[in-house]
Structures are given as C-alpha cells and as structure tokens.
Regions:
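Non-catalytic accessory segments flanking P-loop/AAA+ NTPase cores
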Residues: 1-443
C-alpha cells in the first residue's frame, strides 16, 4: 500500500490511522492525489491538457492541515515541500522570492530519487565498504607469491569481511582516506549566482582532494558509504529523474497563506510580503518555467495546496486571480473534547505511545488510566477555549507537564510500573487551566 496507485478509499483509510476526523479534507486531498496517478496513465498529448486542481484548506492551527498533505506525500513517495507564505517577499525587495519554493521542491525530489537508488544498491554498497575496510586491516599480499598463499589470503579476507559485517571489529581503529567535505551552497539564491558559486568552488576547492583520517571501523563504514555510493550511482540520471518527478508529481504545501491576504482595513499600505507576493505566486501556480541548478522545470503540473487559519482575513481577501487558481476549498473542523480523546487513544503513533516508548528506554513502564486520558483531553480542550486555539498541539504541552517529574527522575523509576491517574493529571494541570491569567503559560 505504499505505491502511487493507491485508491482514494485506501488513502483515506491510511490517513485515518494518523489523523482523527476531517473527513471532507481527507476525501478532497485523496481525490486530488489519485487524479495525479490517473493523469499519468493517459497518452502524452492528453496528459499535457490536464492540470491539477489546487486546494485551499481553511482551518485553525493544529487541526491536521499540514499532516494530511505530508502523510500522503510520504506514503506515495512524492516530492513534497512545505513552505510558509509569510517568509517570502516581492521580487525587488530583500528576502526570498517565491521561485525558491520550486527550487526547494526540486532539491527534495533529487534527494528522494537518490535515496531510492541507494536503497536498491544497499547490499552492493555495503559489500564494497566491507571489502575496502578488510583490505586495510589485512597486510597486503606481496607480489609473486604462490597460488597456495593467494588462496590463504582470499580465505583470510573472507573471514575478515564476515567479522566486519557482524560488527566484531567495530571498535578497532584504522587509517583511511576520505574526501574533503564539500562546501555548502545556498540553493535559494538565483540560478545565475548559483552558477558563480559553483565555479568559485571548482577553482578554490577540489572535491577529489582526500585527507587521511584515523577512525574506528564503525565510523569508517559510514564515511566510506557516502563515497562508494557516489561512485556506484549515476548522478546525471538521478538529477534528470528527480527533475522530471518534481515536474510531474511534485506537491508544494503553502502554509499561512492567510498572512499574505490583504484585508479591507490594510488596503493601500505598502507591504512587500503581501499583495506583491500573491502576484509573484500567480505565474508559478498557473504554470511557468523556473530555473534550478538541475535544469529548468515547468510548474503547470505541480499540485499546490494552500492552507491558512483566516482569523483576521478571509479567503476573499486574496487577489481574485489567485483565488481562481485554488478551485477546491475545504474547511477543517476545530477539535472537540471527544476528538482530542480519540487522538490520544486511536492514532497509530499517538503522543501517549510516543512517551511510553521514550520512557521504556529508561526501564520505566507507563500506563494511562482511561479516566486520566479523558481528563487530559478535557483540560487541553478547555485551555484551547480560554486561550489561543492551537488544536492538537496543546496535547503535547499538557502531557509533557504531567510527565515532567517522571521524565526528569526516570532513573529513580527504572524497573517500575507507573500508572497515570485522573487525580495526577488534575494536580499537575487543573490549577493552571482554571486560571485564565495563567493559561497563557501553557503553550
């Protein structure tokens, strides 16, 4: 169920394991992602005519907007990038221009393809690494030795490789040659400046220069993996595949789009990160060509999902042209006390399970009574009502507060079973939640 051809029903069933409620949002997104698969099954001429139906998600923070898109992109192995609209400025002003989100998507896509190729060659890479380390640990075979000696050496090399693979020699130190670390390049600068940076690096920094390092066998394995991967992988085909995948099935999630909406009260004020950014977004969303360090990419088949709380502005405050580029609108529901409880008990990797796993490392077995979980949900919901509504994120803060002392003194509880009761939850949280002046301290 981890392939691109998941049906909408399968996508929603998968999302239900991690996100409670929001049926309409899940349904709309599932259809949008399935349509990408359907489009790829058509003949080329028709593929070009079908563009994705971009989605605008409306809902307060912490209700699952980002998580829905991120989870689908992950299970379907699609290039995905999440950006915040408020971080961009209009072209001509100091700051990031909107085209950099497309370059970020291409970078993620190339990395995704590279990791897939590495996974396919995993065994081959490990064999090459182990063989190289084994030859370093064994003294070299002199020239002109007999066939018998050669066979003995081959047997010794094989035994050495087996010991290295099993981790028996991980602590032994060896001297190996590794490539110098390459200089990091800022990919968010325009392509022209990027090319200048790359040329300067070629002049002042030879990537093939190697340095000798003394490392443990365990460290040497990791150091050599990256080097041997580069020699076995076809870099050019990976770049081309990454570029193509970003172009045909990439997803850009634009969060906080409401922050660049200009309400009627603000109209007339100069703000380079608002209406100007919307106008810069237009050509990218409707389809244009963006230059990246891997080549040019057309954006017309990239799926754009915009999201915002729209507390201070309305979707209609976005410029009409941009509104038209997001034809599908989904409103996400605020979280109720019941949904808060279900998030804690029914999700596959619930916060409770996460904390239980973390404390189990210290030998502490944590159990939550059902009444305690209900109280956590109730107090978290009340805190959201009295202060800023931050949705499910409130649960992280309240559980952290309840388990704070146990986490701090974990070694004292090692080997014990600790039960979290309703009374414990109340003693840790109720005095804070009850006081509206103090509730702001529960972030």
């Amino acid at each position: 169920m981890s392939e691109l051809n998941m049906t909408p029903r399968e996508i929603v069933a998968y999302l239900d394991e991690y996100i409670i409620g929001q049926k309409e949002a899940k349904k709309s997104i599932a259809i949008a992602f399935r349509n990408r698969y359907r489009r790829l099954q058509l003949e080329k001429s028709l593929q070009e005519e079908i563009t994705p139906k971009n989605i605008l998600m409306i809902g307060s923070t912490g209700v699952g907007k980002t998580e829905i898109a991120r989870r689908i992109a992950k299970i379907m192995k699609l290039p995905f990038v999440k950006v915040e609209a408020s971080k961009y400025t209009e072209v001509g002003f100091v700051g990031r221009d909107v085209e950099s989100m497309v370059r970020d998507l291409v970078n993620n896509s190339v990395l995704l393809v590279e990791n897939e190729h590495k996974e396919k060659l995993k065994d081959k890479i490990e064999e090459a690494v182990i063989e190289k380390i084994a030859k370093k640990l064994l003294p070299p075979l002199p020239n002109g030795v007999s066939e018998e000696k050669k066979q003995e050496y081959a047997n010794s090399l094989l035994k050495m490789q087996q010991r290295i693979a099993q981790g028996e020699l991980d602590s032994r130190e060896i001297e190996i040659e590794v490539r110098k670390k390459s200089i990091e390049i800022d990919s968010n600068v325009p392509p022209e400046i990027l090319r200048v940076q790359e040329n300067l690096i070629k002049v002042f920094h030879k990537e093939q220069d190697k340095v000798k390092k003394t490392l443990s066998v365990k460290e040497a394995k990791e150091a050599l993996k990256a080097e041997i991967s580069d020699t076995l992988l076809d870099g050019e085909s990976i770049k081309m595949e990454g570029l193509k995948r970003a172009e045909s099935s990439g997803v850009i999630f634009i969060d906080e789009i409401d922050k660049i909406a200009v309400s009627s009260k603000e109209r007339g004020r100069q703000d380079p990160s608002k209406e100007g950014v919307q106008r810069d977004l237009l050509p990218i969303v409707e389809g244009s060509v963006v230059n990246t360090k891997y080549g040019s990419i057309k954006t017309e088949h990239i799926l754009f999902i915009a999201a915002g709380a729209f507390h201070l502005a309305k979707p209609s405050d976005l410029i009409p042209e941009l509104q038209g580029r997001f034809p599908l609108r989904v409103e996400l529901e605020s979280l109720t006390e019941e949904i808060m409880y279900m998030i804690l008990t029914q999700t596959k990797t619930s916060i409770i399970k996460q904390y239980q796993a973390l404390l189990k490392v210290e030998g502490v077995e944590i159990a939550f009574e059902d009444d305690a979980i209900k109280e956590l949900a109730k107090l978290s919901y009340n805190a959201n009502q009295k202060s800023e509504d931050i949705g499910a994120r409130r649960l992280h803060t309240t559980i952290e507060k309840v388990l704070e002392d146990i986490s701090f003194e974990a070694e004292d509880y090692s080997g014990q079973n600790v039960t979290i009761t309703k009374e414990l939850v109340q003693s840790k949280l109720e005095d804070l939640v009850a006081d509206e002046n103090l509730v702001k301290y529960i972030l």
